[in-house]
């Protein structure tokens, strides 16, 4: 049984603890996949399909593993990133939320949610009416993990966090799987509000994610965010450095802030089921 992560430890020690916990999670996932998919050995497949080169066989095997992963509905469960017992502030990250997970967040007092995959209309806006009417969805936009977040989004996120800290609110953000877009934003939060360095933030992002090698641009993006936090010029170019854009093109209000409540503008007929 894993011990809960101690919040009183320095950030470096907490990161090391999280990496060990993430490795346990990886091993559990590998065992689950091994039980869900039975793959024949390469030699057997090569005999049946002698025309297939080795890389095709590897791709077939990988595709089978991915199919098993999707079938298991694998997404990161809600995880507390930071909290302040004195004020009541808390921040959670997650993958796509089930009804039970959303209900648990509500029970813990989460008041506002930022959705990074643009899927709130078909999920949270529907589920909130059933079990958690007090939670507000402040942002709902499909960010692209292959492109850097904008300066306007970061400014809106900073304002959201600072208001939440000042008022002692509990906040959460999610993407679809909880590894890439949510991982990048967590890295930014840790550097901006917890004093972590880029290397430390990247280590935790990688430790808590799966299929991170498929998104090699995330590490240099986080390094660029670290330069921004440190007040240094971004040296990575437009591919990784946050750029200034029209706020509305990033799902923000024209004033460059998060909306009051995305779901308030959705009727039953507008909800995608």
Question: What is each of the regions a protein language model found here?
Answer:
Residues 31, 36, 40, 47-48:
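Intrinsic, low-complexity polybasic segments
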Residues 2-10, 14, 18-29, 33, ...:
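Cys-dependent protein tyrosine phosphatase-like superfamily
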Residues 39, 43, 62-63:
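Short terminal hydrophobic/aromatic SLiMs and anchors at protein ends
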